[in-house]
């Protein structure tokens, strides 16, 4: 099994938290990310949320945009 970092796991937890706060499914979030120009499937969203896939700076930018949050919100403990 691939090792993950605390930051990767933290981002996954926050993505799931904000997705659920918005009442979205993983499929809903994937669709919104695609509209924003970031091609992530539901499966990739699931891997990010479970901490098994790192996110790029571009993807982080798009999560912030789609959720309508700040970078501080995403990285806050």
Which role fits each region the language model picked out?
Residues 1-22:
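A short, Lys/Arg-rich alpha-helix, primarily the initiator
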Residues 2-6, 31, 65, 72-77:
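Short, charged recognition helix plus adjacent turn
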Residues 15, 26, 42, 57-60:
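Helix-turn-helix DNA-binding elements, focusing on the entry/boundary residues of the two helices
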Residues 18, 32, 48, 77:
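Residues in the recognition helix of alpha-helical DNA-binding motifs
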Residues 20, 34-35, 50, 61:
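Residue-level detection of the helix-turn-helix DNA-binding "recognition helix"
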Residues 23-47:
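Short alpha-helical DNA-recognition segment
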Residues 52, 56-73:
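DNA major-groove recognition helix of helix-turn-helix/homeodomain DNA-binding modules
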């Amino acid at each position: 099994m691939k090792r993950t970092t605390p930051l990767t796991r933290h981002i996954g937890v926050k993505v799931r938290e904000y997705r659920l706060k918005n009442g979205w499914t993983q499929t809903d979030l994937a669709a919104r990310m695609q509209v924003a120009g970031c091609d992530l499937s539901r499966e990739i969203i699931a891997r990010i949320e479970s901490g098994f896939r790192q996110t790029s700076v571009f993807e982080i930018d798009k999560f912030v945009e789609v959720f309508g949050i700040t970078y501080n919100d995403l990285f806050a403990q």
